[in-house]
């Protein structure tokens, strides 16, 4: 492509897929644009709408909790007090369920926001990598030792090998993984506190449900930890292999063409 201006590439890369469209990489640019638009809609439109909807759904139950609590304060009958407490607790559990769901959706929104940011980081790095490759691809042998040293810094090995698109993918994965670790840990702590409070109420069914949520999010957190570690270790191996094979990228020319020397005949040429 003749569109090889660095300032314009970087300027357009501020927009989803812009640098790719500018450099005529339309398929990749279209994929990035579609993914960023979908995540933007989910983070800024759908999630707030869902939270507002749940808040409205919980309002009648919250009002009922207040009504039965007030009635409990105004009664002196033990039988009526027990009945009112049972009704209040039932509505209180419904309100807690809405609160739990809202907390989960908010933490999911934060994780999706991180993936959106990571995707845009990849968008910028990959656009810059396209610009670098358009200027000519280096086929010099790179040092494996230097590649390993740089690879200890996340993305450093890929940048050393001038694989900027891979560096962007690495940063996207690490940003998403470590943010998801933080959000799931926040939910674990939230449910641990909920379980601690509920134990004083002798509500064994609710306590069991909370324990299941704690186990579920601990498993998710551990998966993200392992995922982040695997991505990092893979980036180190990838940097070393790319450095080892860096001088293998010399173009091998293979051509089949007619030859008119000594009569019409086919010829095969291999240029090392």
Predicted segment positions?
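Glycine- and aromatic-enriched membrane insertion/assembly motifs of diderm outer-membrane
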Residues: 28-30, 37-44
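Short, solvent-exposed beta-strand-terminating loops
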Residues: 42-50, 181-187
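Active-site-surrounding "flap" and adjacent substrate/cofactor-binding loops of secreted or lumenal enzymes
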Residues: 49-64
């Amino acid at each position: 492509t003749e569109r090889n201006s660095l300032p314009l590439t970087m300027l357009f890369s501020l927009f989803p897929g812009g640098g790719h469209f500018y450099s005529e990489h339309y398929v990749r640019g279209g994929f990035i644009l579609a993914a960023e638009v979908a995540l933007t809609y989910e983070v800024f439109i759908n999630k707030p709408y869902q939270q507002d909807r749940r808040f409205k759904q919980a309002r009648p139950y919250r009002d009922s909790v207040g009504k039965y609590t007030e009635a409990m304060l105004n009664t002196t009958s033990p039988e009526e007090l027990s009945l009112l407490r049972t009704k209040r607790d039932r509505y209180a559990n419904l309100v807690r369920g809405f609160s739990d769901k809202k907390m989960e959706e908010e933490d999911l929104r934060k994780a999706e926001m991180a993936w959106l940011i990571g995707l845009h980081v990849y968008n910028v790095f990959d656009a810059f990598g396209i610009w670098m490759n358009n200027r000519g691809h280096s086929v010099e042998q790179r040092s494996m030792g230097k590649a390993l040293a740089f690879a200890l810094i996340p993305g450093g090995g890929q940048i050393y090998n001038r694989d900027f698109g891979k560096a962007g993918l690495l940063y996207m994965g690490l940003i998403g993984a470590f943010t998801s670790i933080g959000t799931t840990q926040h939910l674990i702590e939230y449910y641990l506190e909920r379980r601690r409070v509920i134990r004083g109420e002798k509500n064994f069914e609710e306590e069991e449900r909370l324990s299941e949520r704690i186990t579920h999010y601990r498993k998710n957190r551990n998966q993200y930890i392992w995922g982040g570690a695997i991505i990092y270790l893979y980036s180190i191996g990838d940097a070393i292999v790319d450095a080892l094979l860096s001088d293998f990228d010399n173009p091998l020319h293979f051509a089949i063409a007619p030859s008119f020397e000594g009569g019409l005949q086919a010829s095969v040429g291999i240029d090392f």
